[in-house]
Amino acid sequence: MLDYTLAEVASAVRGELAAGSADARVLSAAIDSRAVDAGALFFALPGERVDGHEFVAQAVTAGASGAVVSTTRPRDSFGDLPEAFGLIMVDDPARALARLAGWHRRLMKASVVGVTGSAGKTTTKDMIAAVLAESFSVLATEGNMNNEIGLPLTLLRLQPGHDVAVLEMAMRAPGEIAALAETARPDVGVVTNVGYAHIGLLGSQSAIADAKAELVRALPAHGFAVLNGEDPRVRAIERFAPGRSLLYGLSPECSVRAVDVALSEDDTSFAVALDGQAVPDVRFTVPVPGRHNVLNGLAALAVGWRLGIEPEAMARGLASFRPSAMRMHFVQAPRGFTVIDDTYNANPASVRCAIDAALQHAAQRRVIAILGDMLELGDAAAAGHAELGEYAVYAGVSGLVTVGPLAALAAESAVQAG
């Protein structure tokens, strides 16, 4: 819960308190009038289909203490408002939301961990939160609250009792992660990989790597970067770290290294060497299949290690991890079928990981992959889908069902591959 005056908020967002009592309290923030409760500050954000300015009256009815609105809207356009209802006029309500979140973050004692990457960032974020929760009070991104609107709303849930905030950072264009980092001011930056996600928007993997590097560049001198040592493009980002950095992976040069990896139908386990020294008497288990989850788990352990958590506590935290909805979610269906729901989002790297995890879980059973179109791949779309068809065959998938014109290229490629 927040507890600021309207005057304090107006100053923080660089706006003008045009109506209402300067001493009125702001207890929360909302962008949806249906989610407003007593004391909330309603941010009237313009959207493609609806404009928040049309719902200020509903926010009043729901008990909001005020609204942040654009200076382009005349005061009388909101109808008859209560005398005590605050109106803060700003140039850009979305930017004002980010400013309030950044100001609030600076008043809290919590450290901030930022997580980005082309694939695996949600799973890695959830694993980091699970590991840290063994020793700290943790706030973590929920659902898809990882953009210029969701991240500020998450930060505004930060309380004095929180020790750490683990924030997922997504992007669709250069500069977006830099803007998120300006708001969140991360102390730790985690980059999982550089793949083909959004290559249709950014143009090349090099451009994607540059965008991901914005998180590392934003770290303070006392912060540290946690980077996937198995991805050459991520390793190259290390040179941008203002402070300390470490690599995680399976290679000997990685500071946090997995050894003795064991894959089973239901989980993935491994031992760990830290700076070349084996962690004795502790084995780490991720309760989901998939070799890629070794790397996700190592990222979480690297953060936990740097924040001083004991190995035994980290092992307990990692074992408690549960995936978010529609991300490698296992559903037991009738007649002995297992449905693996990984439908939230897809790019070539994440689909390969899903296929590998399904085959690992299936053991001797048949695996049928259902593949839809992967979007925002630009010029790489045709090749990306075709390569997945080949990969499915060579990996051992028994059948492939495709939906959509791009996914049909995967089916054609699978037939040609046998």
Regions found by a protein language model. Name each.
Residues 1-114, 123-134, 149, 156, ...:
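Short, basic phosphate-binding NTP loop
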Residues 9, 40, 59, 100, ...:
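Residue-level signal for inorganic ion chemistry
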Residues 17, 87-89, 112, 138-140, ...:
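Conserved beta-strand scaffold positions in the cores of enzyme catalytic domains, especially
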Residues 20-29, 95-98, 146-149, 169-174, ...:
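Short gly/ser/thr-rich secondary-structure transition/capping motifs
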Residues 47-50, 324-326, 343-417:
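Active-site beta-alpha connecting loops in nucleotide-dependent enzymes
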Residues 56, 60-61, 181-182, 393:
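Non-catalytic positions within long, well-ordered alpha-helices that form the structural scaffold/packing
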Residues 74-82, 188-338, 365, 390-393, ...:
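Acidic, Mg2+-coordinating active-site environments of NTP-dependent enzymes
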Residues 89, 94-229, 235-241:
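Phosphate-binding loop of NTP-binding sites
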